[in-house]
């Protein structure tokens, strides 16, 4: 029989439905309360009703659930300690966008060996989010694949759209449907206009096609997300300095958008040298302590151990060390959080 379709598809595997995964790993009432309260807190911080600073911190990507839970335990202690000045949320990224190729994250390849046991990856990710939230530690993630959100979005307090997908129409439409506040990164070249356009697009109603929780293809009609914001992540040059922030605020004002933004300490802002995140923190803390109201949040790449490691066949991995972007170690992370908390004192 002749075919004109699926000619380059090697195989098609069955995928668990979001509803079935949620039955196996069910959200509890206490976790619901954590997620709802955190989303509300972020909205209040964004709109200037809460003077605290949002801090999204954690590993570049999650590859080891055990190490991630240990990190969450440690971070929760800081969340409690600084709760009057900071709203600390753990970065739990399960999908990795790639410029060309590479490991695409815990959900796609949980065994780190190219076996692509996606159903297992989804289960590991959802269980991990339940474990982290059960501690009272809210979770943040990047939404890359537009279907994966159906499996985990109920456990996410803050979401991001990455620099490579901010300009994508379907990601803007998806953001308009998400129940959490969503940050849009500026382009990899530093262009902030695409992020501002994304905020404007996600703010209004859309319709798009996607499977529902039971796997049935549906037409989604969205109400729009009022809590979109820009994440300044640098580009060809850093963009966390006062002039960069003032320029971004001016552009936000032109479109009557919330004049608050988030600073990513990593990526282009640290010139891809992870230790420079400490320099970014020093500058941002200075700006906050000297009256900057525009900076409502920051993002930091941090793990138990400093740096990164390469996955090699038959070689054990160093516990608590990133396998994607290099991260700050725990000691430096504690110092940065303390520095940010001290800076926020000026707002009270």
Curated annotation (Swiss-Prot):
**Superkingdom field:** Bacteria
Enzyme Commission number(s) from the entry:
2.5.1.54
Q: What SUPFAM superfamilies does this protein's entry cite?
A: Aldolase
What are the GO BP annotations of this UniProt entry?
amino acid biosynthetic process; aromatic amino acid family biosynthetic process; chorismate biosynthetic process
Pathway(s) per entry:
Metabolic intermediate biosynthesis; chorismate biosynthesis; chorismate from D-erythrose 4-phosphate and phosphoenolpyruvate: step 1/7
Keywords for the protein's UniProt record, in alphabetical order: Amino-acid biosynthesis, Aromatic amino acid biosynthesis, Transferase
List, alphabetically, the GO terms of the cellular component aspect: cytoplasm
Q: Which reaction does it catalyse?
A: D-erythrose 4-phosphate + phosphoenolpyruvate + H2O = 7-phospho-2-dehydro-3-deoxy-D-arabino-heptonate + phosphate
Coiled-coil stretches are none
> What class does this enzyme belong to in the EC scheme?
transferase
| Residues passing through the membrane, by range | none
* Molecular-function GO term, any one: 3-deoxy-7-phosphoheptulonate synthase activity
User: What's its job?
Assistant: Stereospecific condensation of phosphoenolpyruvate (PEP) and D-erythrose-4-phosphate (E4P) giving rise to 3-deoxy-D-arabino-heptulosonate-7-phosphate (DAHP).
UniProt family annotation:
Belongs to the class-I DAHP synthase family.
Q: What is this protein called in UniProt?
A: Phospho-2-dehydro-3-deoxyheptonate aldolase, Trp-sensitive
**Species of origin:** Buchnera aphidicola subsp. Acyrthosiphon pisum (strain APS) (Acyrthosiphon pisum symbiotic bacterium)
Upper taxonomic lineage: Bacteria, Pseudomonadati, Pseudomonadota, Gammaproteobacteria, Enterobacterales
């Amino acid at each position: 029989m002749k075919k004109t379709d699926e000619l380059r598809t090697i195989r098609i595997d069955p995928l668990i439905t979001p509803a079935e995964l949620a039955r196996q790993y069910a959200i509890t009432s206490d976790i619901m309360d954590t997620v709802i309260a955190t989303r509300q807190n972020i909205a209040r911080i964004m709109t200037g009703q809460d003077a605290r600073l949002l801090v999204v911190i954690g590993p570049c990507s999650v590859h080891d659930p055990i190490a991630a839970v240990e990190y969450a335990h440690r971070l929760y202690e800081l969340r409690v300690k600084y709760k009057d000045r900071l709203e600390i949320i753990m970065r739990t990224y399960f999908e990795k966008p790639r410029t060309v190729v590479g490991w695409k994250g815990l959900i796609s390849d949980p065994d780190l060996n190219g076996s692509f046991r996606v159903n297992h990856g989804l289960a590991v990710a959802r269980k991990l989010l339940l474990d982290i939230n059960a501690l009272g530690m809210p979770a943040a993630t990047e939404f890359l694949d537009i279907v994966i959100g159906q499996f985990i979005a109920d456990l996410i307090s803050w979401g991001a759209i990455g620099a490579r997908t901010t300009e994508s129409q379907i990601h803007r439409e998806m953001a308009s449907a998400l129940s959490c506040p969503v940050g849009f990164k500026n382009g990899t070249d530093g262009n902030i206009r695409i992020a501002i356009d994304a905020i404007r697009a996600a703010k209004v109603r859309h319709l798009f096609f996607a499977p529902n929780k039971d796997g049935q293809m549906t037409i989604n009609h969205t109400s729009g997300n009022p809590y979109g914001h820009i994440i300044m992540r640098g580009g060809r040059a850093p963009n966390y300095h006062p002039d960069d922030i003032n320029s971004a605020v001016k552009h936000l004002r032109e479109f009557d958008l919330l004049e608050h933004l988030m600073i990513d300490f990593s990526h282009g802002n640290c010139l891809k040298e992870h230790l420079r995140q400490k320099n970014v923190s020093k500058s941002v803390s200075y700006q906050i302590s000297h009256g900057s109201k525009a900076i409502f949040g920051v993002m930091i790449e941090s793990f138990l151990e400093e740096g990164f490691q390469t996955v090699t066949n038959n070689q054990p991995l160093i516990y608590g060390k990133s396998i994607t972007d290099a991260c700050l170690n725990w000691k430096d992370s504690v110092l940065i959080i303390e520095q940010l908390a001290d800076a926020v004192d000026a707002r009270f």
